[in-house]
Amino acid sequence: MVKRIIGITMSLLLLASLNSYACTNFIITKGASTDGSVMVSYSADSHVLYGELYHWPAKTYPKGTMLDIWEWDSGKYLGKIPQVEQTYNVVGNVNEFQLSIAETTFTGREELGTPNGIMDYGSLIYVTLQRAKTAREAIKILTDLVEEHGYASTGESFSICDKNEAWILELIGKGEGKKGAVWVALLIPDGYVSAHANQARITTFEYQKKNDWFNPKQTVFNSKDVISFAREMKYFDGKDSEFSFSDTYAPVDFGGARFCEIRVWAFFNAVKSGMDQYWDYAKGHIKRGAHGYATNRMPLWIKPDKKISQIDMFKFMRDHLEGTELDMRNDIGAGPYGNPYRWRPMTWSVDGEDYVMERATATQQTGFSFIAQLRSWLPDAFGAINWFSVDDAGFTVYVPMYSTITKIPRPYAVGNGDLMDFTLESAFWVFNMVSNFAYTRYELIYPEIEKEQHRLHTSFVRETLELEKKLMEIHEKDPKLVLREVNNYSNQAAERTHQEWKNLFAYLFTKYMDGNVKTKQEVPEGYKYYAPKVEQFELSDKWKRLIVNDTQGKVKVIKEGE
């Protein structure tokens, strides 16, 4: 999501929007997953995004119908485009044909970031999901929409995945008064994984004179002018074979590495040995070569040491740079209870020097996140699961929402509360209650939450496998029953999660309020009532010394005679 400023100076960083460096995508190809799924994760991170599950039912429209386009970020009206006669069912960012689209915003060159088109990046995602059946078709439709109606956002990286293929598409507008965009899309090789996190990542590629969309041998698509436009704008003067999309249209800088690429590094490091060679780069040390291009960047994709499951994906989304020198649990910013979160802004200055707060994958301002699981060996009627969640990925639970459901569970439905309208009936608010309470004493409280996350996640994985065995037996005979079954299951799982998290908050608040840790005890014989066991944990010696030094002895016990 929005918005990153290129050529960042620290003063500009201080002025960055509330949504800076938002969103993370991890992409797993069929050959890299434990069961042959294609998977893609997405965290929609914004201080002003309310977490809810969008739904567009499949519909038939009269010929000539027009579709209003409203900017996803702001709600601003952008214009109208022709509607197609038939649209598809979309649940969040996954449709009924097992197509999923996610994104992260890299913004790119400022002069290219103010086009006056109709199609913003959010509308491109959700309109395309209603119209496309495969990743290749989605790339064609999305780029055609931009060409026909103009682009209305800054630079974007899109993850476009179906049950067989996973693609990365990077796109940026042409600036004020210029319609369309320049773009390139690459197929991730099977058996590999990729990621992006608010920094453009496609570098060199084999330029295509023609996009033969449905030729399986073509693994690169691009706009005709992706290189010539860069020459026209005096961004590039080398050979076509040397042209790097990212280094030309969104050169990586300190912020792009430290706040963005470091999240890609954390994922890559979790799945493949040897990633320490890119650690200096991820921290923000950029080396430059010909054309000013960075020379020490990470590869666009890597082959993992072992195959990846959806349970692994849930874990990757909870990363806080644990185990690295930037592990946020270990410095003074963590407070006395090892909190791996830092409140914004991410940049600050003192005594004439500039500093940063780290930006990890899991962050407090997430509106919603998901892992799309797309499975070619299952019928589309129940082949795709949108493992959907709300709030901070570090504290959330991913609930299995089949992409064909037609009834969205009430706790996750659009219109059930908003960012300034609290309700206990909303999963977003209940999960925020738990996470925000846990931030106060992370070391003590989070382990209890983690147990509940694992219990629910393993239960959901087991239950979906059992359900799908049953559905395989009936899907050809009774498709209506299949639809009823997936609706019932996803709604039941969501309602159960919502209630369990309300119960969890009640348990945690009762146990940990007022700085104590209370344990219920049985009432002994002969007693009318009995107080709970109360424990009070001392601060670490490190924090005791910090207090002593900061208070300059004022808190020292005065001994008689002193």
Residue map of PLM features:
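Second-shell loop/turn segments in exported
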Residues: 113-115, 123-132
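Positively charged n-region of N-terminal signal peptides that target proteins for export
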Residues: 1-5
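Histidine-centered catalytic/metal-binding microenvironments
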Residues: 454-562
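Bacterial N-terminal signal peptides
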Residues: 7-17
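Accessory, solvent-exposed terminal regions and/or long lumenal/extracellular loops of proteins
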Residues: 267-355, 359-361, 447, 451-455, ...
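Substrate-recognition/cap regions that form aromatic- and gly/pro-loop-enriched pockets
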Residues: 332-473
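Sec/Tat signal peptide C-region and signal peptidase I cleavage site
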Residues: 18-22
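A contiguous strand-loop segment
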Residues: 23-121, 141-308
